[in-house]
């Protein structure tokens, strides 16, 4: 019975795709079937979604729309995507539909999008069937790289803004990503059902910041469905179809990839020209390697195999690639022996934050190595290098896009591979410009410094350089003084200050990346009671007075605790490290001096007092010289012990300093 229902409800819908010409002649009948499919039970809808789509190549380009949803974090982007998929009949209407496109456990737990996802929809409008390709995007600043890749496959975007929170820092960044890509931008105010919502005020913000007219702004609620039914028609009317030609040779852009343990690398392609058929051989414009298409199709929202992908379409391919290193994001693919001009690629992901990852037990090193290798197959933006610490043993030094990226990577290690690690305090890549030439380098050549051990002496360099970012902070104007003081304390340089409405301020500062990777965001939220938002983008390097700070225990340097600091912050940083060590190192039989030094000069010191044995306890009277003699002998013994004694620094002490 279930099989009969499936055939009755669904079969005509896929015949529409296979025989587009016959569909035009039978518009009324197909419309009735579509309407019935949307009103049917969840079982029928599930069956519909499971049916393979086999003839997408016949779909005309003018009936295709590729769009993305961009927004600040927690503005309802994933919930809106769920509602659109429900309206199009891709998934059944159910209260269980929450973050359908967020596949990772960490995404569902944190309520954020980390990995860009794609879903195709079939939607009937004015008697015509359209293929809508939705590409969901992350909202956090660390994953801007994912956003820029997704936008390369689109012709338009939905710019979603919370109707109560208004324009935030990431809203500004995402708008300009879409604007620079010359995409059609449809502004959408979400969460209008909330009591605190003020759509008119937020619409005026959009006009003031982005020059978007209030009447162009759509007002919806993804939670209760208000206004959602008008979004898909608006997308069809306002977003242009892709510009492409199916008669030209194949030209396809690879804009994302992930790893499957059974099938190898699965790549997401945007077909710019020509068409791609299962069994054909393609060639990479980057590596010149050739691959055979083993499988291809669209995401609906799960993988649905097809025979062909045509011009303007977005879909997945399986081509026997063994590593995501073969699937270079931004690469152009063409048919073998039919070369084409490569499409403009992407800037490679640049690590902004470095941290050491070490196993809790040295015996688990190989387990950690295997877990990191498997995880980086799905996240090619992470750079990995071997590392070794005198205190923590062998490990790895990893480069991340930001602090949230680092946290998410660590959480995925624990959840997906059951590996617990020690993460050292994050640092940033400095540079040193060498004073003299040598066999291995030119005069004034720049060297990237990612670890303190690489830090050159001041006599060898002309200047040190530190990475800086252009930060955008949006907050209520009553916190203006606190925000200015915070940015000044972080050695920031003010660029611009403007009001986005009567009460909210947008502040732009050039800030050292080293100053914001630890606790800047926490301080920002604390000083503004959570009302501020922060976004940053790379702004190159600038000259800085840097120094290598060493930690000495009774005059002996501890290499594992050496770090690079700005000279202005050397005394404060040294004091903090010395205090942490004083609390973590157990008392010895002799006094222990903890010193922080820069170029041999002590900038901070703490002393751990010796454990004192009462050697005069057995003296119950008599001459005082007897007590003095015992005390003198004890003092001499401690002096000898201090000269030959070796301080054992426990692992907990290193963790107190190195761990974030």
Curated annotation (Swiss-Prot):
Q: Which reaction does it catalyse?
A: GTP + H2O = GDP + phosphate + H(+)
Q: From which residue to which does the signal peptide run?
A: none
- Residue stretches spanning the membrane: none
Keywords per UniProt: GTP-binding, Hydrolase, Membrane, Mitochondrion, Mitochondrion inner membrane, Nucleotide-binding, Protein biosynthesis
According to its UniProt record, where is this protein mainly located? mitochondrion
Subcellular location(s): the record lists: Mitochondrion inner membrane
The residues that hold GTP are: 71-78, 136-140, 190-193
Q: Mind telling me which CDD domains this protein's record contains?
A: EF4_II, EF4_III, LepA, lepA_C
Could you tell me which Pfam families the record lists for this protein?
EFG_C (PF00679), GTP_EFTU (PF00009), LepA_C (PF06421)
Membrane topology value: Peripheral membrane protein
Q: Give one GO molecular function term.
A: mitochondrial ribosome binding
The answer to whether UniProt assigns keyword rRNA processing to this entry is no
Q: Which residue intervals define the domain tr-type G in the entry?
A: 62-243
Q: What is its EC number?
A: 3.6.5.-
Q: Name one GO biological process term.
A: positive regulation of translation
Additional observations: This protein may be expected to contain an N-terminal transit peptide but none has been predicted.
Stated role: Promotes mitochondrial protein synthesis. May act as a fidelity factor of the translation reaction, by catalyzing a one-codon backward translocation of tRNAs on improperly translocated ribosomes. Binds to mitochondrial ribosomes in a GTP-dependent manner.
Descriptive protein name: Translation factor GUF1 homolog, mitochondrial
């Amino acid at each position: 019975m279930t099989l009969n229902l499936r055939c009755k409800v669904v079969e005509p819908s896929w015949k529409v795709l296979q025989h587009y010409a016959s569909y035009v002649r039978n518009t009324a009948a197909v419309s009735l079937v579509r309407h019935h499919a949307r009103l049917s039970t969840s079982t029928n809808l599930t069956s519909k979604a499971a049916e393979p789509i086999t003839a997408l190549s016949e779909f005309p380009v003018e009936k295709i729309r590729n769009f993305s949803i961009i927004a600040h974090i927690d503005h309802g982007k994933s919930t809106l995507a769920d509602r659109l998929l429900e309206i199009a009949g891709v998934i059944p209407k159910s209260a269980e539909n929450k973050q359908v496109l967020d596949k990772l456990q960490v995404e569902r737990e944190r309520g954020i999008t980390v990995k860009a996802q794609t879903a195709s929809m079939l939607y009937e409008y004015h008697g015509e069937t359209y293929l809508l390709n939705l590409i969901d995007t992350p909202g956090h600043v660390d994953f801007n790289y994912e956003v820029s890749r997704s936008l390369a496959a689109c012709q338009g975007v939905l710019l979603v803004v919370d109707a109560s929170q208004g324009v935030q820092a990431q809203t500004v960044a995402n708008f300009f990503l879409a604007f620079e890509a010359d995409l059609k931008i449809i502004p959408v105010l979400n969460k209008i059902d909330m009591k605190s919502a003020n759509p008119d005020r937020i619409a005026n913000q959009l006009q003031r910041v982005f020059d978007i007219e209030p009447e162009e702004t759509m007002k919806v609620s993804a939670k209760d469905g208000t206004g959602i039914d008008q979004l898909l028609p608006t997308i069809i009317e306002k977003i242009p179809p892709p510009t492409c030609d199916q008669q030209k040779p194949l030209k396809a852009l690879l804009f994302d990839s992930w790893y499957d343990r059974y099938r190898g690398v699965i790549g997401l392609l945007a077909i710019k020209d020509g068409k791609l058929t299962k069994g054909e051989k393609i060639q990479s414009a980057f590596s010149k390697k050739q691959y055979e298409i083993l499988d291809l199709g669209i995401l609906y929202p799960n993988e649905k195999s097809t025979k062909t992908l045509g011009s303007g379409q977005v879909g997945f391919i399986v081509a026997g690639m063994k590593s995501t290193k073969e699937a270079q994001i931004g690469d152009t693919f063409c048919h073998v022996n039919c070369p084409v001009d490569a499409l403009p690629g992407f800037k490679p992901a640049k690590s902004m934050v470095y941290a050491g990852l070490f196993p809790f037990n040295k015996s688990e090193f190989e387990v950690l190595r295997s877990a990191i290798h498997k995880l980086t197959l799905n996240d090619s933006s992470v750079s990995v290098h071997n590392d070794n610490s005198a205190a923590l043993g062998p490990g790895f030094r990893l480069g991340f896009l930001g602090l949230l990226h680092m946290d998410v990577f660590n959480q995925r290690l624990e959840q997906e591979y059951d590996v617990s690690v020690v993460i050292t305090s994050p640092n940033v890549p400095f540079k040193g410009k060498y004073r003299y030439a040598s066999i291995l380098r030119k005069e004034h050549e720049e060297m990237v410094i990612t670890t303190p051990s690489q830090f050159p002496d001041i006599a060898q360099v002309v200047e040190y350089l530190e990475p800086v970012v252009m930060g955008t902070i949006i907050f209520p104007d009553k916190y203006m003084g606190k925000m200015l003081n915070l940015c000044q304390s972080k050695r920031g340089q003010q660029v611009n200050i403007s009001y986005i409405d009567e009460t909210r301020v947008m502040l732009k500062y050039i800030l050292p990346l080293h100053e914001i990777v630890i606790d800047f965001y926490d301080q920002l939220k604390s000083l503004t009671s959570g009302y501020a938002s922060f976004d940053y983008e790379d702004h190159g390097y600038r000259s800085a007075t840097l120094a290598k700070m060493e930690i000495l225990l009774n005059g002996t340097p501890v290499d594992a605790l050496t770090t690079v600091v700005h000279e202005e912050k050397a005394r404060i940083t040294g004091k903090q490290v010395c205090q942490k060590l004083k609390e973590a190192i157990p008392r010895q039989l002799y006094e222990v001096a903890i010193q922080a030094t820069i170029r041999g000069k002590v900038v901070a010191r703490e002393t751990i007092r010796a454990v004192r044995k009462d050697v005069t306890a057995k003296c119950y009277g008599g001459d005082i010289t007897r007590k003095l003699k015992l005390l003198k002998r004890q003092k001499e013994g401690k002096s000898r012990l201090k000269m030959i004694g070796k301080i054992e620094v426990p692992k907990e002490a290193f963790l107190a300093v190195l761990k974030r």
